[in-house]
């Protein structure tokens, strides 16, 4: 894997290219790209995303969605945020995870992430993938997002590996099948 900063520079260039923005060369596949990185580079990636968000010279409309912040917003909407620590203390982490996974699913994430209208030049960048684990699984969320974001590119900042068929979070966890992403960004 090449140097993380060099790879992020390539992302900066890529998201502004008309072929990327228009989904050219994808053979009618969805325009979902995965940028894989070592989880130890998380702070470098976060800094890069923060810089992109304030870059007035970008030739695209970057829409950054931190999935962990989205998760917290969903918890706030459900008025359960304050109860979570007590629930974990009383019933344990496994029970809390089970209850949250039952209560908060892909539908809630899609509803929170969705915006309209999508405009030409929009790029949805998903961040916070490692932070939101284990409350949501990326392969399942991407499947759920596809019908709502088929007209704009989606770029996932992924702390792990994607080999074109399997997503493996943190380069350690059991891989999950995901076949629809077009490619990973080297």
Please identify what each model-predicted range represents.
Residues 3-81:
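N-terminal, charge-rich interaction modules
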Residues 17, 105-117, 138:
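A short, acidic, amphipathic alpha-helical segment used as a generic capping/interface helix at domain edges
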Residues 31-33, 37, 41-44, 48, ...:
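Extended, basic/helix-rich recognition subdomains
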Residues 40-44, 70-71, 99-106, 130-134, ...:
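Short acidic, S/G/P-rich loop/turn micro-motifs used as interaction or catalytic elements
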Residues 62-110:
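Long, charge-dense
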Residues 90-94, 123, 149, 164-165:
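Surface-exposed peri-terminal alpha-helical interaction modules
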Residues 119-135:
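Conserved P-loop NTPase "ATPase switch" module shared by AAA+ and STAND
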Residues 137-186:
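Glycine-rich, aromatic-bearing surface loops/beta-hairpins
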């Amino acid at each position: 894997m090449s140097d993380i900063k060099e790879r992020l520079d390539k992302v900066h260039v890529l998201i502004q290219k008309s072929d990327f923005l228009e989904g050219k060369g994808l053979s009618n596949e969805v325009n979902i790209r995965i940028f894989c990185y070592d989880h130890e580079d998380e702070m470098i990636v976060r800094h890069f995303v923060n810089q992109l968000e304030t870059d007035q010279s970008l030739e695209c409309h970057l829409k950054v969605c931190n999935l962990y912040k989205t998760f917290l917003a969903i918890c706030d909407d459900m008025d359960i945020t304050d109860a979570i620590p007590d629930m974990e203390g009383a019933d344990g982490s496994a029970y809390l995870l089970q209850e949250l996974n039952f209560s908060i699913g892909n539908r809630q994430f899609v509803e929170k992430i969705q915006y309209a209208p999508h405009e030409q030049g929009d790029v949805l960048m998903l961040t916070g993938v490692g932070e939101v684990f284990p409350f949501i699984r990326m392969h399942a969320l991407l499947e759920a997002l596809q019908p709502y974001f088929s007209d704009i590119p989606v770029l996932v900042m992924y702390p792990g590996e994607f080999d074109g068929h399997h997503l493996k979070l943190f380069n350690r966890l059991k891989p999950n099948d995901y076949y629809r992403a077009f490619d990973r960004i080297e």
